[in-house]
């Protein structure tokens, strides 16, 4: 039995990322031993990379009212379709920039098999801050970090990730609310020893940490694609400008999404109260 599988989370509107993603994947991780699942909504990847299963997570499902499933619903359905307990989470705009240390990924996946109490191991320098050593090469992470449950490249125990999902949440709301749910549930996330790697130096999985921001290309992607002979019509999306304010329609949509997360907010209040009661009880003993 394989020790882990790989989930590349995406949506059909990001189809333009799939070919460059897997072209760089084949170049920088040609001997990847794990099965790769692409979490599409309805579409099927038809590129040259053969070891890719398009999940088409929304196909055949009734999605009333909205017409589209939420990010969390799609991720839940994908995780339920996978066959391993440990999942390497990636996204379609995490474009590889150098060779992957597949041996390190395998070692940490094996550690998760050996220690079923580990819910998550962050593998990137963009992960959560380290606190203290726990296992060889692994540190505990800071549960007070706002993005404790972040969506960067990580090994997840499938059931742990499923337990943090709430169907109404987007990726950004999951990172915000899911981080607090993980803290209040006393999940102890781990991160690789920060002294071993950095953004500029060694990385287990070297990649651009987000190739698309608010639907637009992140500038360094153009240089990466040019260097590898990857053609892309960048004018379709345009490039992200941090000085550009989102249009009024986008702000209205965001406000509507915030309103839809009222259940998450109520749940967190209850979890926080219980967490603080337990903390006070422990402090009084």
Roles of regions detected by a PLM:
Residues 1-20:
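N-proximal low-complexity "stem/linker" segments adjacent to membrane-targeting elements
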Residues 23-33:
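Short, acidic, metal-binding catalytic loop of nucleotide-sugar glycosyltransferases
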Residues 37-86:
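Active-site-proximal specificity loops/subdomain of glycosyltransferases
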Residues 85-95:
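Short beta-strand-to-loop acidic/aromatic patch adjacent to the donor-nucleotide binding site
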Residues 148-216:
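Catalytic core and acceptor-binding pocket of nucleotide-sugar-dependent glycosyltransferases
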């Amino acid at each position: 039995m394989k020790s882990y599988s790989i989930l590349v989370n995406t949506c059909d509107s990001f189809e333009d990322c799939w070919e460059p993603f897997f072209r760089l994947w084949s170049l920088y991780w040609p001997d990847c031993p794990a099965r790769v699942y692409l979490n599409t909504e309805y579409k099927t990847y038809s590129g040259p990379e053969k070891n890719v299963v398009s999940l088409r997570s929304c196909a055949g499902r009734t999605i009333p009212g909205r017409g589209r499933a939420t990010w969390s619903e799609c991720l839940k359905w994908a995780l339920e379709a996978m066959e391993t307990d440990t999942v390497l989470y990636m996204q379609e705009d995490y474009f590889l920039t150098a060779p992957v240390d597949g041996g390190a990924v395998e070692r940490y996946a094996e550690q998760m098999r050996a220690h079923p109490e580990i819910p998550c191991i962050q593998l990137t320098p963009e992960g959560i801050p380290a606190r203290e050593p726990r296992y060889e090469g692994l540190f505990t992470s800071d549960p007070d970090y706002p993005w404790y449950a972040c969506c960067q490249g990580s090994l997840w125990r499938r059931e742990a990730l499923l337990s943090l999902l709430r169907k109404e949440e987007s990726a950004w709301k999951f990172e915000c609310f899911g981080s607090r749910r993980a803290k209040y549930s006393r999940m102890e996330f781990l991160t690789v020893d920060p002294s071993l790697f950095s953004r500029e130096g060694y990385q287990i999985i070297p990649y651009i940490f987000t190739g698309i921001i608010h639907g637009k290309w992140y500038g360094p992607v153009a240089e990466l694609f040019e260097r590898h002979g990857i053609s892309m019509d960048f004018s379709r999306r345009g490039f992200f400008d941090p000085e550009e304010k989102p249009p009024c329609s986008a702000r209205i949509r965001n406000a509507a999404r915030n309103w839809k997360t009222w259940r998450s907010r109520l749940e967190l209040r209850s979890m926080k109260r219980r967490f603080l009661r337990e903390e006070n009880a422990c402090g009084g003993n």
